[in-house]
Amino acid sequence: MSVAENTDGIAVPDEEMLKRHVAAEATVKSFHYEKPTGGKSAKGRVNLGKSDNIRGVVQIVKKAGGENNLHYHTNASSFWMVLKGRVRFYGPDDKVIGEFGPHEGTMTPRYARYWFENIGDDDLEILQVGAYGDPENDSSGRTDSSPQRYQIHTSDRYEGVVEPKK
């Protein structure tokens, strides 16, 4: 697989690269996020989209409950940004990493131990964009470092709207 340049310095893909372009372009998706209503769990997840090496999710953490436990991921780094509410992130020994409000956040690299909780007066809506280190492995490699406060597999799960509002 190679890319040659024409005389104008423009990349000209070979046949294999062109196949990759076409395959990738066939999976481009748009989305629109709206907070779901009617969830019964203390936590919800709205899946916005994913590819082989990146995932986008909005986590909704209700005021009473839904906080997670100290953990890390062996196969994913995450970028976190608060959309609504307030969050406090902690590291080992409950050391505060930071408190964040709308349009603020943090980045947690692979193997960094952390947990977070909703510290606002309303539900927390937080965007998580995860970059996966091994595209062949669909798991983030979540590994608990302390007992779970909230059973993560009991959260309400939703799919984001694929076509954006017009």
What is the role of each PLM region?
Residues 30, 58-60, 79, 105-107:
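Conserved hydrophobic/aromatic beta-strand scaffold that supports enzyme active sites
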Residues 79, 107, 121-140:
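A short hydrophobic beta-strand segment most commonly corresponding to one strand
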Residues 117-119:
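Asparagine-centered strand-capping/turn motif at beta-strand->loop junctions
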Residues 112-115:
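Short, charged beta-turn/beta-strand-edge "cap" motif at the junction between a beta-strand
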Residues 59-63, 72-89, 129-132:
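Short, conserved beta-strand element in jelly-roll/cupin
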Residues 1-55, 69-70, 142-166:
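A short, N-terminal "cap"/entry segment at the start of jelly-roll beta-barrel domains
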Residues 94-110:
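Short acidic-glycine-tyrosine-enriched beta hairpin
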Residues 52-53, 75, 94, 121-122:
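Short strand-connecting beta-turns/loops that link adjacent beta-strands
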